[in-house]
From Swiss-Prot:
GO cellular component: cytoplasm
Alphabetized SUPFAM superfamilies for the sequence: Aspartate/ornithine carbamoyltransferase (SSF53671)
Residues where carbamoyl phosphate binds: 60-63, 87, 111, 138-141, 271-272, 316
Sorted UniProt keywords: Arginine metabolism, Cytoplasm, Transferase
Name of the molecule in the record: Ornithine carbamoyltransferase, catabolic
Superkingdom of origin organism: Bacteria
Binding-site list for L-ornithine: 170, 230, 234-235
Encoding gene per record: arcB
A Gene Ontology molecular function term of the record: ornithine carbamoyltransferase activity
Catalytic activity: carbamoyl phosphate + L-ornithine = L-citrulline + phosphate + H(+)
GO BP: any one term: citrulline biosynthetic process
Pathway, per record: Amino-acid degradation; L-arginine degradation via ADI pathway; carbamoyl phosphate from L-arginine: step 2/2
Subcellular location: Cytoplasm
Family as reported in the entry's similarity comment: Belongs to the aspartate/ornithine carbamoyltransferase superfamily. OTCase family.
């Protein structure tokens, strides 16, 4: 049953920090409801007749597919604009582009590099803008993560989530702050040189003093409910690969780490794509250069009963749908 519905109409969805605990939990409740409706073939055309621009500076599989299917299910018309279709800040300023798109579209999704770009789109377009990923935050991913955790564990409050890997990336930032807002015990486990920015840590601690930042794997994973990792090198950082491999080898998620939690029901999450074998061109290249058949997670863990990564990937669509419906849709 849905909790009391907050009024989110016309709001942009740029980062978790812009929302209260009640609002984030409402997104999850709505996502669960829409997921059930889709499963049962019940129409939910809350965006009937709306036009949505999907702006992608960065390529994507899950984000693009999730937004496209979500738009279609909600009755909206999605228009994909890749980096070759739109020149944000090159031939036309972001401000001018936002004003043009706002005259033609009812909502805008942006996936790219600078967070300032998505903020400018929101400030100048006059329509709801949704952050599909920036270098700073990845809020639609976090909503999917939270829904997946709640589905498998039954709650969020006091759930111990350990993020292991590059603690400075957008996924870690969003999990740290978003998890703290909903009352989770979030722990970031990474070498000190990759700890989150102090401003992000301070922001998370405003919501929950339990936040832990540590380089000690054993300390971090003790009694964990969720182990989460991401790629060791984000898009645009490929030149740092050799350095990151050496730094993060001790933080690989393997069965030894899973067992160290002491929780036989611990779940494993990853925002994907994951480098857990050599079945890709990238995986082959890494193996040839560094002799690694697995990187941030072993194939054993990835394919184990603990892994919920494909539930998590599916939930991108349901949570994105909830965000669009709540901020743009006719929910009466």
């Amino acid at each position: 049953m849905l909790m009391t519905r907050p009024n989110l109409k016309g709001r942009s969805f740029l980062a978790e920090k812009d929302f209260t605990q009640e609002e984030l939990l409402y997104f999850l409740d709505l996502a669960a409801e829409l997921k059930e409706k889709k499963k049962n073939g019940i129409p939910h055309h809350y965006l009937e007749g709306k036009n949505v621009a999907l702006l992608f500076e960065k390529t994507s599989t899950r984000t693009r597919c999730a937004f496209t299917v979500a738009c279609t299910d909600l009755g909206a018309n999605p228009e994909y604009l890749g980096k070759g279709d739109i020149q944000l800040g090159k031939k036309e300023s972001v401000e001018d582009t936002a004003k043009v798109l706002g005259r033609m579209f009812d909502g805008i999704e942006f996936r790219g590099f600078n967070h300032e770009t998505v903020e400018s789109l929101a400030q100048n377009s006059g329509v709801p803008v949704w952050n599909g990923l920036t270098d700073m935050w990845h809020p639609t991913q976090t909503l999917a993560d939270l829904l997946t955790i709640r589905e498998h564990i039954g709650k969020l409050k006091n759930v111990k989530l350990v993020y292991v890997g590059d603690g400075r990336n957008n996924v870690a930032n969003s999990l740290l702050v978003g998890g703290a807002i909903v009352g989770m015990d979030v722990r970031i486990c990474t070498p000190e040189s990759l700890w989150p920015a102090q401003e992000v840590i301070d922001l998370a601690k405003k919501y929950n003093e339990q936040v832990m930042i540590t380089s000690n794997v054993e300390e971090a994973v003790a009694n964990a409910d969720v182990i989460y990792t991401d790629v060791w090198v984000s898009m645009g950082e490929e030149e740092k690969f050799a350095e990151r491999v050496e730094l993060l080898k001790p933080y690989q998620v393997n069965m030894k780490m899973i067992k160290a939690t002491g929780n036989e029901n611990v779940i494993f999450l990853h925002c994907l794509p994951a480098f857990h074998d050599v079945e890709t061109m990238y995986g082959e290249e890494v193996y040839e250069k560094y002799g690694l058949k697995e990187m941030e997670v072993t194939d054993e863990v990835f394919r184990s009963k603990h892994s919920k990564v494909f539930d998590q990937a599916e939930n991108r669509m349901h949570t994105i749908k909830a965000v669009m419906a709540a901020t743009l849709g006719n929910m009466e």
